[in-house]
C-alpha cells in the first residue's frame, strides 16, 4: 500500500472501478475520504489534498501501527463498498467523536448514518431527524463540509423537489453512488 504523510494525517489509496480514491487517518481514526478523481494526487505532482486540503510532508514518514491498521481497514471497507459488498456503516463504526465536529454536525451525521443504502432524504427531513427541524440550509452546509463522504453518506441527501442538488467537485457522483446502491431515478420529481 502506498502511504503518504499529509499534514498531521496519513493517506493511502483505495481502488474502485472508477479509479483510485484516498482515505486519511490520524491517530488510528478515519478523518477524510476522497472519491476517485477528486483529490490532488494526479494534479499536484503526487501530493494528496488531505482531509482539509493539506500538503504532503511533515511528521514521521512511516505511520505507527494504529494508523497503518486504520488505513488498511478503511481502504478495504471502501473497496468493499465500491465492489457492492458493503453499503452502510453504523454510528458505532464511524469515529465521529474524533472528527472535530460541532454538536450540530455530529447530530446530522449520526442521523444520516440511519438512512439505508439506495434511499434518499431531503435536507429538511434530515434536519428533523437530527432534532433541528428548521435547519435544512444548515444541513446543506454540513453535507458540503462532510470530510468522509460515502462513509457518512451525504450522497443520500437530495432537495425537497427530488432533484439531486450539489455534491462536491463533481455532482455526477451523487447519482452515481445512489445508483450503485440500487436507487432508481424512475418517477423522481424534477427529472
Give the location of each predicted region.
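Regulatory, non-catalytic segments
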Residues: 134-149
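…primarily DNA-binding HTH/wHTH and HhH modules…
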Residues: 160-191
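Basic nucleic-acid-binding alpha-helical/helix-turn surface characteristic of O6-alkylguanine DNA
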Residues: 1-133, 184-191
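Short Lys/Arg-enriched helix C-cap and helix-to-coil transition segments
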Residues: 150-157
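Gly/Ser/Thr-rich beta-alpha loop segments that engage phosphate groups in nucleotides
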Residues: 21, 120, 133, 142, ...
